[in-house]
Amino acid sequence: MSSSTVRDLQRDLENKANDLGKIQKDIGKNHQLRKKYTIQLGENELVLKELDLLEEDANVYKLIGPVLVKQDLAEANANVRKRIEYISAELKRLDAILQDMEEKQNNKRETIMKLQQRLQTIQAGKAKA
């Protein structure tokens, strides 16, 4: 094989390695975002448990900017449930994206390994010649 073929393979290997790095960075971002949503889900579930403990005529206040505003218990309950639904849906979406990215990562790794083996075979053949 010619040295230009080896150079092309090396360039291709470098490009694939860069792509793999980008995928891994995206996976890291996804994990961070997922962690944030998981924390928010836990906090909202705690709020919901606290709201469930209250009597029907209890006063509930919502912090809006620097001001506490009185809110109806049923409305507060509904808002927290909607938030939990939204966060749960986001977590499912992130899980699907993560699964897709991990598949892409595995495919890139396989491609990189095949390219490396091919390069090593070519270079070993040149060394014998």
Swiss-Prot record:
It is found in: Cytoplasm; Nucleus. SUPFAM superfamilies: Prefoldin (SSF46579). InterPro entries: PFD_beta-like, Prefoldin. It comes from the Eukaryota. The keyword Membrane does not apply. Heterohexamer of two PFD-alpha type and four PFD-beta type subunits forming prefoldin co-chaperone complex. Interacts with PFD2, PFD3, PFD4 and PFD5. Interacts with LSM8, a specific subunit of the LSM2-8 complex, which is a core component of the spliceosome. Binds to HSP90 to facilitate the formation of a larger complex made at least of HSP90, PFD6 and LSM8. Binds specifically to cytosolic chaperonin (c-CPN) and transfers target proteins to it. Binds to nascent polypeptide chain and promotes folding in an environment in which there are many competing pathways for nonnative proteins. Together with other chaperonins, contribute to the regulation of gene expression by modulating the spliceosome function on pre-mRNA splicing post-transcriptionally by acting as a co-chaperone of Hsp90 to control levels of LSM8. This is Prefoldin subunit 6.
